[in-house]
Amino acid sequence: MKKRIRELTDLLNQYRQEYYTNDAPSVSDSEYDKLYRELVELEQTYPAYILKDSPTQLVGSTILTGFQKYQHQYPLFSLQDAFSREELNAFDQRIKSAFPEAEYLAELKIDGLSISLVYEAGVLKVGATRGDGTIGENITENIKNIKDIPKRLSQALDVTIRGEAYMSRQAFKTINEERQENGEPEFANPRNAAAGTLRQLDTRIVAKRQLATFLYQEVGLETADSQQKTLERLADLGFSVNSHYLLSSSMNDIWDFIQSIEASREELPYEIDGVVVKVNQLAIQEELGFTVKAPRWAIAYKFPAEEKEAEIVSVDWTVGRTGVVTPTANLTPVQLAGTTVSRATLHNVDYIAEKDIRIGDTVVVYKAGDIIPAVLRVVEAKRRDQAPMPIPTACPSCQSQLVHFEDEVALRCINPLCPSLVQRSLEHFASRQAMNIAGLGPAVVEKLYSAGLVHDVADIYRLSLEDLLTLDGIKEKSAEKLLAAIEQSKANSAEKLLFGLGIRHIGAKASRLILEAYGDLEALLAVTAEELAQIDGLGLVIGQSLVQYFQQEQAAQLLAELKSAGVNLAYLGQRPDQQAALFGLTVVLTGKLEKLNRTQAMEKLEQLGAKVTGSVSKKTDLVVAGSEAGSKLAKAQQLGIRIEDEDWLLNL
């Protein structure tokens, strides 16, 4: 069971990164949810085996490059998902058993990108993406180019507003028509288009693409006593608020509303993927609180994905950077979710065996997250006399013997010199989330590798203009740009480099946590797995994987070569000061401050080592209360939590 929990944790973390960070999931929502539920059940049965990097303990995605990081004043949580009436009923029973008077507000789940807007004295100061729920991207200039977001409020408020940025169906159609005319690749769906737009560095493009928003949450003020009144207040302040919602104490009414919305969703001018059900009374929300991942007072009902039938014509097998061999089905073309689909992932050999998928089968295809086509099941009634799927025994790239480890679902090539494995590793190193070397994509990597110019990541920093000009299709101007991008990457903070090395289990978030703790990549040559496991957010498996990598002689040699080439090995971000006055304390701000605005107060608390949260609980160590403090102060007094005022904070 321990191995299965580790395997599920790794798989789900990979899929989370694909969905939240790259906006390109490789598995369907339903496949992800099936694996997630299996993990939840195993963790409930074997709680001692819960890993610190388990997706059940995490929120959202990791940070991308290209924009400054932004530390959220209050975490942005994910939502618990539901896929059936029974799950909604279970949610209802859990809530009503503790709070019989609870009402629900059902709101549309907009298929967009979560945003957070910070206002100081009524002026928009920061617009940010969710990121991993704690650290997002500062996209303020792009946010200011969304027409329906107020730049200044009618009241001088210090407040954070949360919601979704999206692209309407009409705007999506227009932009894809323009891209088609210009010979550019079309966006797969409006969510992808919205995500790509918000990450544009040219703000004129953002303004042109006509993004819109729906806002639904107010954080940091205590001016409303219900979710419905919060929506009304947001509308009064000038925000766009979705008018399709239902208030009821009956889950029967909520279910009728969900069914009605699902039946008419295609008539809406924007895309939705479900309905969010929230406890309406904010006082009850406060009492229910949060798990590490999601609020206990809300649940998201997800609509099933669109499905179509297609025939499998053939199967391609490709090798990834970790050696995993992935099967992809070539299909008879079919229209699915607005695009023509002719290829779909088959995930792995265990999935093929479990579904008994064969070449020539008619299969049901759907889009994972409305993006990546995947095979869901075989239409047994249409099967003829097809033979079972031939499974390769040799690597399609290097012809080495493939292995299928007992605790894994995939075939794997374990030849470290496999051309596909090496090339995918180089592509990963150059990717946006890693070293962000613009121009070093798959086509250029293949040319460099085939020419014998690069075999590992250190070779990238040995490339010269003369080397690049020997390659087909590489002109002097593009070669100079690539060399400039390589040179620029040398100055990256070391967590980008650590992630780019592609060490198993070491994702972008783990890389940041490790470098925050140790400060320098060379320090990792002497750490132990047990020491690494003490870092909050990591586990022993991550520690063991990192130590195993850096114990190799070639790892020390690689670091030496990178350092000699001028690549930065130090962490450039802010590291926690364990001697700070409030280090390790969980602090809540409430009420109106006279001398500091809320952002200044939060920054001061964080500089003093505190973790600032938005709600009072038994885990809260300290409450800093201003004038007109409301329910948070009362709850802190009830729980016997230490309470201080603004002057106390200023004097620290």
From Swiss-Prot:
Q: Catalytic center at which residues?
A: K109 (n6-amp-lysine intermediate)
Q: Which InterPro entries match?
A: BRCT_dom, BRCT_dom_sf, DisA/LigA_HHH, DNA_ligase, DNA_ligase_AS, DNA_ligase_CS, DNAligase_adenylation, DNAligase_N
Catalytic reaction annotation: NAD(+) + (deoxyribonucleotide)n-3'-hydroxyl + 5'-phospho-(deoxyribonucleotide)m = (deoxyribonucleotide)n+m + AMP + beta-nicotinamide D-nucleotide
Q: Name one GO molecular function term.
A: DNA binding
Q: Where does Zn(2+) bind?
A: C395, C398, C413, C418
Gene3D superfamilies per UniProt: 5' to 3' exonuclease, C-terminal subdomain, 6.20.10.30, BRCT domain, DNA ligase/mRNA capping enzyme, Helix hairpin bin, Nucleic acid-binding proteins
Q: State the UniProt keywords alphabetically.
A: DNA damage, DNA repair, DNA replication, Ligase, Magnesium, Manganese, Metal-binding, NAD, Zinc
Which Enzyme Commission numbers does its entry carry? 6.5.1.2
Give the family this protein belongs to, as stated in its UniProt record. Belongs to the NAD-dependent DNA ligase family. LigA subfamily.
Q: What does this protein do?
A: DNA ligase that catalyzes the formation of phosphodiester linkages between 5'-phosphoryl and 3'-hydroxyl groups in double-stranded DNA using NAD as a coenzyme and as the energy source for the reaction. It is essential for DNA replication and repair of damaged DNA.
| Protein name, per record | DNA ligase
